[in-house]
Swiss-Prot record:
Organism name: Schizosaccharomyces pombe (strain 972 / ATCC 24843) (Fission yeast)
SMART domains found in the cross-reference section: BRLZ
Lineage, uppermost ranks: Eukaryota, Fungi, Dikarya, Ascomycota, Taphrinomycotina
Gene of this entry: atf1
Protein name: Transcription factor atf1
SUPFAM superfamilies in alphabetical order: Leucine zipper domain (SSF57959)
This protein's UniProt keywords: Activator, DNA-binding, Meiosis, Nucleus, Phosphoprotein, Transcription, Transcription regulation
Length: 566
């Protein structure tokens, strides 16, 4: 293996080599302006723990090569000198693929890091970093969280999102906003950790390293997930906008535990939850079904906590009856037109605005509207007896919804229907109780579609009478409408005539006034002309009139006519 290029430095430093998992500090102090360190990068994973010592040009392993500064001064350039501080930065990938036991536990050199203990004070604290753990530790939820001597997880605040209790996947989007939170460190009171964060991380490019900005991403370079994505996947921030009652509750019914050393990091998904994003995605259809179905089962109380909280929150809000939400959507058409089963009504819990319609004849209101107890149509519907007809036919269908003015009574007149039959009242029992006719429009636009109260259909002379009466009513209504239209027309005509007469009077008076003004002005003009003619030979009048004519109008034929008086 050929030695790496030799670098020069203006500051004294010491280099430590780690070999076979044991910390062997073979540092050699060199005079100022005469130090040169050379590192041989590890070739592969098998040679990391066997050969990590420095190789000098003379072939001595574990020693620092002392070269002549005169031999190195020719190859030193300003750009090469700017990257000298990379020599003091430890290689974070030397022990990345080591065993878990050798990281932080079996290898005490990683805790105290002797290679960084003797770095002079001139080196920035950003390079005093611990090494990365193996990949197997990165995939675990709590990586090096309890390791002694480590204030911040991994020593890199930008990578601290891997150690969060809600993080179970190193590629999870929750790392995006990890550095934006004030609790990204397990121990924010540690001054060294705060100093390391303020001075940059080992993966953050420095002032003289602009070429590394595109090669080394950090957690702060990614945007934070949107609120909808964060709520769906469970990546809640600690300053969540939702109340505590909407947080995730584990299956055992226990409240969320407090995780972390500060006591302010609440674990929304439990300490033992694995791959919480997929778990929440699998629970979204279940929660939607719980909201749509009646909440009557109390066997799994912990699982339905979120649904109950949402239902209570909605019921506390006040909505108008037209926009009131319904959590129990009933898709059965017979539930609206059929009778309510007492047992089904006990098991199915409906909102309060449905309960008002169940106390009247056992019928819920159509389309979920609120039923008014003082409604006369409801009283008439409740007093109508349908038990005899239902007993004869064996059917449980209720009559269609009608208004108070549309219900046939004993004193009502026969109404013409579309199929040629008419409604006539009689005391005879109905021969065909199931005979139904399509609803037609009467004066109010509605008619009953079912025979009730012992009414029956009759044909013959009554139909002719009803037809004649219907035509007479139509004729009367037509004449009445014509009379009303003629009356309105006459009223509009009178109004137009009155307005026209008022305009005529106004313009006549104005014309008289203007005529009087014209006459007065003419008289004044005549008097002025008379005065001018009487004083046309006066020298003062001539001079004054000439001066006025010259200054105001100007010299010309008009001025001469003014002077002459005409």
């Amino acid at each position: 293996m050929s030695p790496s290029p030799v670098n020069t430095s203006t500051e004294p430093a010491s280099v430590a080599a780690v070999s076979n998992g044991n910390a062997t500090a073979s540092s050699t102090q060199v005079p100022e302006n005469n130090q040169s360190d050379s590192f041989a990068p590890p070739s592969n994973n098998s040679q990391q723990n066997q050969q990590s010592s420095t190789i000098a040009p003379n072939g001595g392993a574990g020693s620092v090569a002392n070269a002549n500064p005169a031999d190195q001064s020719d190859g030193v350039t300003p750009s090469f000198v700017g990257s000298l501080k990379l020599d003091y930065e430890p290689n974070p990938f030397e022990h990345s693929f080591g065993s878990t036991a050798s990281v932080g536990q079996g290898n005490p050199s990683l805790n105290r890091n002797p290679s960084l203990s003797n770095i002079p004070s001139g080196v920035p604290p950003a390079f005093a970093r611990t090494l990365l753990p193996p990949v197997s530790s990165i995939a675990s939820p709590d990586i090096l969280s309890g390791a002694p001597g480590i204030a911040s997880p991994l020593g890199y605040p930008a990578w601290s999102a891997f150690t969060r209790g809600t993080m179970h996947n190193p590629l999870s989007p929750a790392i995006y906003d990890a550095t934006l939170r004030p609790d990204y460190l397990n121990n924010p009171s540690d001054a060294s950790a705060a100093a390391r964060f303020s001075s940059g991380t080992g993966f953050t490019p420095g002032v003289n390293e602009p070429f590394r900005s595109l090669l080394t991403p950090t957690g702060a370079g990614f945007p934070a997930p949107s609120p909808g994505t964060a709520n769906l996947l469970g990546f809640h921030t600690f300053d969540s906008q939702f109340p505590d009652q909407y947080r995730f509750t584990p299956r055992d019914g226990k409240p969320p535990v407090v995780n972390g050393t500060n006591g302010d990091q609440s674990d929304y998904f439990g300490a033992n939850a694995a791959v919480h994003g997929l778990c929440l995605l699998s629970q979204v259809p279940d929660q939607q079904q719980k909201l749509q179905q009646p909440i009557s089962s109390e066997n799994d109380q912990a699982a339905s906590t979120t649904a109950n909280n949402l239902l209570k929150q909605t019921q506390q809000q006040t909505f108008p009856d037209s926009i009131r939400p319904s959590f129990t959507q009933n898709t059965n058409p017979q539930a609206v037109t059929g009778t309510m089963n007492p047992q089904a009504s006990r098991t199915q819990q409906q909102p309060m605005y449905f309960m008002g319609s169940q106390q009247f004849n056992g019928m819920p209101s159509v389309y979920g509207d609120t039923v008014n107890p003082a409604d006369p149509s409801l009283t008439l519907r409740q007093t109508t007896d349908f038990s005899g007809q239902n007993a004869e036919n064996g059917s449980t269908n209720l009559p269609q919804k009608t208004s108070n003015s549309d219900m046939p009574t004993a004193n009502s007149m026969p109404v013409k229907l579309e199929n040629g039959t008419d409604y006539s009242t009689s005391q005879e029992p109905s021969s065909n109780a199931n005979n139904q006719s399509s609803p037609t429009s009467s004066i109010n636009g509605k008619a009953s579609s079912e025979s009730a109260n012992g009414t029956s259909y009759s044909k013959g002379s009554s139909r002719r009478n009803s037809k004649n009466e219907t035509d007479e009513e139509k004729r009367k209504s037509f004449l009445e409408r014509n009379r009303q239209a003629a009356l309105k027309c006459r009223q509009r005509k009178k109004q137009w005539l009155s307005n026209l007469q008022a305009k005529v009077e106004f313009y006549g008076n104005e014309n008289e006034i203007l005529s009087a003004q014209v006459s007065a002005l003419r008289e004044e003009i005549v008097s002025l002309k008379t005065l001018l003619i009487a004083h046309k030979d006066c020298p003062v009048a001539k001079s004054n009139s000439a001066a006025v004519a010259t200054s105001v109008i100007g010299s010309g034929d008009l001025a001469q006519r003014i002077n002459l008086g005409y």
